[in-house]
Amino acid sequence: MAKTLVVIDAENVRRSTWPNLSKEELVARARAWARAEGAPILVVFDGPPPEDAPDLIGSGGRTADDVIAELEGPFWLVSSDRGLRERVRDRAEKIIGGGSFLRNALHAT
């Protein structure tokens, strides 16, 4: 896998399966996947992240979508949010749906 940053829209992705993943479970699975793939990740949360770590950021007074939309490319986006996907399509090398990411990537670890 390329070493391109993989940006994960946390609230969108954790709600892509039933039952919904907790913030902590999403972080644990995303980190396990990143280690296995050798890929850097950035998990972006609405509000504060569940812990203070360099691979997790909160949105402050904005939405996670706005934070992600302001990121410089290139990056991969993991989100099923159509509006966000449209906002970043010129900078995203690859866009992966949240459910697909959880089923295919995270369960493979």
Kindly give the residue locations of the regions a language model identified.
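Nuclease catalytic cores that cleave nucleic-acid phosphodiester bonds
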Residues: K3-I8, N12-T109
